[in-house]
């Protein structure tokens, strides 16, 4: 497990490889509170599929795997597995609630193209 914090205070911690916004962390905290299970963590992953080749996925998980990178923000944990990590380095994980609806959004500088809905991409 790799621990990541917004400000790396010790040499054992890695620099921040992605941004987990306050809006996203606060929404995750709200959803976890609604579930009533404080052991839940948000897992963000990349898998094959979608109209552009890869797609993002979000799920709640109670387990932290050995190869996960863990980011702590506002009292919640974000998990990214080692395969997905390479596609998400430099990305911003945000939560938007506007006229287009409410959803988690990933702004990924590694994506060369994205589909219209923003849930799939290619590199």
Swiss-Prot record:
Its cofactor is iron-sulfur cluster. SUPFAM superfamilies: HesB-like domain. It holds the Pfam family Fe-S_biosyn. Binds 1 iron-sulfur cluster per subunit. GO terms for molecular function: 2 iron, 2 sulfur cluster binding; 4 iron, 4 sulfur cluster binding; iron ion binding. InterPro entries: FeS_biogenesis (IPR000361), FeS_cluster_insertion (IPR016092), FeS_cluster_insertion_CS (IPR017870), FeS_cluster_insertion_RrpA (IPR023063), HesB-like_dom_sf (IPR035903). One of its GO terms (biological process) is iron-sulfur cluster assembly. Keywords: Iron, Iron-sulfur, Metal-binding. The keyword Protease does not apply. Iron-sulfur cluster binds at residues 51, 115, 117. It comes from the Bacteria. PROSITE patterns: HESB (PS01152). Homodimer. Belongs to the HesB/IscA family. Required for insertion of 4Fe-4S clusters. This is Putative iron-sulfur cluster insertion protein ErpA. The gene is erpA.
């Amino acid at each position: 497990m790799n621990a990541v914090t917004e400000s790396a205070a010790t040499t054992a911690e890695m620099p921040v490889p992605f941004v987990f916004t306050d809006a996203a962390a606060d929404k995750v905290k709200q959803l976890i509170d609604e579930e009533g299970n404080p052991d839940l963590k948000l897992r963000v992953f990349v898998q094959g599929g979608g109209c552009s080749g890869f797609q993002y996925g979000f799920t709640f998980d109670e387990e932290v795997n050995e190869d996960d990178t863990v980011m702590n923000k506002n009292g919640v944990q974000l998990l990214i597995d080692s395969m997905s990590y390479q596609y998400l380095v430099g990305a911003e994980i945000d939560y938007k609630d506007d006229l287009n609806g409410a959803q988690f959004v990933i702004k990924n500088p590694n994506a060369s193209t994205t589909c219209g809905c923003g849930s799939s991409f290619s590199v």
